[in-house]
Amino acid sequence: INRLAVCLDPTPESIRIALSGGAEMILAHHPLTMEGRFTDRLDSYHEVLSLVFRADVPLYSAHTSLDANPLGPVSWLADELGLCRIPSSDTKDGEAGHGMPLPLTVLEQTGTMERGGGSYACGFGVVGDCAVDMTPEDLKKMLALWLVGSCPRLAGVLPERIRRIAICPGSGSSLAPEAAACGADLLITGDLKYHTALDLPLPVLDVGHFSLEEEMMRRFALQLKENVSDVAVQFVPAQDPLAPFSPTD
């Protein structure tokens, strides 16, 4: 493989752009389908399969394996906010004890990963402490730098001082109880549902599924460029399929 294209979703448009750029392999985050199905109708699923089969280009999805690696690009927003690991005494299970210390604390631990002769805890969502407590206005300003075009929705009331923040790109509202148990002041995620929002143990900021993971994949492409120097890596940007709509415009 000499040319690799990286994208969030394997949509027909993204696949066409990747192929027109000469991609010999396409790496997406989300799978083409979440469950097995037949190509029994002419839709986007059929179209993507036709495109990659005709071009003889493999399509690979790094989904939960990427989501669960706290040392990967999934932690990009935590890095930008300058979050650091919380004391082990504040976690539900104490210190993970898997060998390698992590810069952040994993929320929902699912196992371990091997790296450089050592192992470390992996799982979904991270939680960390701010170097300096933030006000809600401080947080707004920082998020505005990185979540351009996002229309966040807040469930709950933010405290006047925000010290500990949990983050889970994608759909992470199910982690709210564990984030609260770790003493988090806020959970940042996407895809928050109405009835879930009515019964949360801490404030949850829904910044959208797309905004966190699109930037995650852009940074993943940059990491691959740096670490796999003999492969030309192209990031294929996309647009949020959920566009803001104002009835007053």
Task: For the regions a language model picked out, list residue spans one by one.
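Active-site catalytic microenvironments in core metabolic enzymes, especially phosphate/sugar-handling
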Residues: I1-D249
